[in-house]
């Protein structure tokens, strides 16, 4: 399928209770930006692997570059939280992939894994990695009959239900919506929902299961 369909299929997987990741590069990601923005407004987890290559345009499609950080950081119309992980080694790539799914599920936000062509073309044997044999249980709830997908929450994180798991309807919509998921243009609801979504920026910074770390020299500009 094309990139537009791919990211929407991924969002459908998360909506149904699964775990999905899409992988692309350059212009392919440009086609995914509307789907990325959709993930932002419906507060859906999503994992996106963006393999950087030299642009603009087709650029140098078989060479390496690290020029897409701003693209990942600001892609998608409108303002919504996202996280970006950038592995520098194959070992870190495995770890980042695991953590990306945990972080996306915990924050109900898109999470990027940002790599470059050099890393993707690399290959060597690795020692056994301490990765779990099975993924953690998804953070979904059994819905009550009066379930509201976007219920107000102090940290911006509403309980995430999925269709068929409980008694409630799980409404999602790319238009602005109220707590129950119904389309609205009321200014006070718009302000409240924007503030709710942006609260998750603090959540992304402070999630205890994803401690801050720094790999590489303490001062990369001089070392």
Please name every model-derived segment.
Residues 15, 74-81, 171-179:
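Short acidic (Asp/Glu) and glycine-rich catalytic loops that position anionic groups and cofactors
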Residues 96, 101-223:
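Flexible, low-complexity linker and terminal segments
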Residues 70, 75-79, 86, 125-136:
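Metal-ion/cofactor- or nucleotide/acyl-coenzyme-handling active-site neighborhoods
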Residues 1-74, 83-104, 221:
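Thiamine diphosphate
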């Amino acid at each position: 399928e094309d990139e537009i369909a791919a990211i929407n299929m991924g969002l459908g997987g998360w909506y149904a209770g699964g775990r999905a990741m899409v992988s692309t590069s350059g212009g392919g990601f440009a086609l995914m930006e509307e789907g990325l923005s959709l993930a932002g407004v419906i507060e859906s987890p999503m994992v996106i692997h963006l393999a950087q290559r030299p642009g603009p345009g087709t650029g140098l499609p078989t060479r390496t570059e690290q020029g897409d950080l701003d693209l990942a950081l600001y892609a998608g119309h409108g303002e919504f939280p996202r996280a970006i992980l950038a592995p520098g080694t194959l070992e870190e790539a495995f770890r980042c992939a695991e953590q990306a799914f945990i972080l996306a599920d915990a924050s109900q936000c898109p999470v990027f894994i940002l790599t470059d062509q050099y890393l993707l073309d690399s290959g060597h044997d690795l020692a056994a990695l301490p990765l779990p044999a099975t993924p953690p249980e998804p953070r979904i709830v059994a819905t009550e009959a009066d379930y509201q997908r976007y219920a107000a929450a102090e940290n911006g994180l509403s309980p995430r239900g999925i269709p068929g798991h409980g008694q409630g309807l799980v409404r999602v919509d790319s238009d602005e919506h109220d707590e129950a998921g119904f389309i609205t243009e009321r200014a006070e609801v718009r302000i409240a929902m924007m503030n709710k979504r942006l609260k998750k920026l603090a959540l992304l910074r402070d999630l205890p299961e994803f401690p801050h770390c720094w790999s590489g020299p303490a001062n990369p500009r001089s070392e």
